[in-house]
Amino acid sequence: MVDIATQLAAVDRGIQTMDVDGVPSYVQTLTQTYPSPIDEVWEALTSAGRIERWFLPISGDLKLGGHYQFVGNAGGEVLACTPPTGGQASFRLSWAMDPTAPTYVTVRLTGDGDHTRLVLEHVAGVEMLPPGMWEQFGPSGTGIGWDSGLLGLALHLTAPDERPDDPAAWTMTDEGKAFMRGSADAWAAAQVADGTDAAVAKTGADRTYGMYIGEVDGPWSE
């Protein structure tokens, strides 16, 4: 059994609507501290053999300037990469379902002995998202996916035997649905903190949850 309540509570979520390099953007952040040293977390995040054990199979050249592709998901380029030194590490990627509309992901690690703080920042230019996506789904449209990734990483690092054998099938169990519902609600709260009306945020969270359980078409549906 996955302790979904503990995992949901372990993540701090933020959303800001702001200009990034002069481009109107949505900036999502997720922060979690793992009970693992920075070298171990870095290896789990940057080794193809490790990544597929907690996220998705990946192909490509995982080094600065290299290109990568997750099976059935996003791909992009490694734009910056600083391995652990002095208790700090980071990397930056372009991240896109559609190569003509890239978004950007930065991951920063801060080590403190046997613990590591991870901050994931996802920057999406307003014009890079499918038309109407943000208005319909809000930050949970991508946020549930990021929450699922951090859950996978947490289980990989701390309780690998508890990771579902088939994560995709797990999302359709009562436990998996409860996790996605909790994630959607948490992102709605973060959106309200950014100034969005609570009713609008809740509607987006409800629609996103419906998308993830197959009751609502997603933004990339034909």
Locations of the language-model features?
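A contiguous binding-surface segment within folded domains or other stable secondary-structure elements
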Residues: N73-L151
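Short beta-edge strand/loop motif at the mouth of beta-sheet-based domains
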Residues: G22-V23, T29-L30, S36, A48-G86
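Terminal "cap-and-tail" regions of soluble proteins that handle hydrophobic small molecules
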Residues: M1-G22, V123-E222
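Short small/polar-residue motifs
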Residues: A9-Q16, F55-I58, N73-E77, P102-T106
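Structural motif
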Residues: P35-P37, D112
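N-terminal pre-domain segments used for targeting or regulation
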Residues: T17-G22, A48, L56, V105-V107, ...
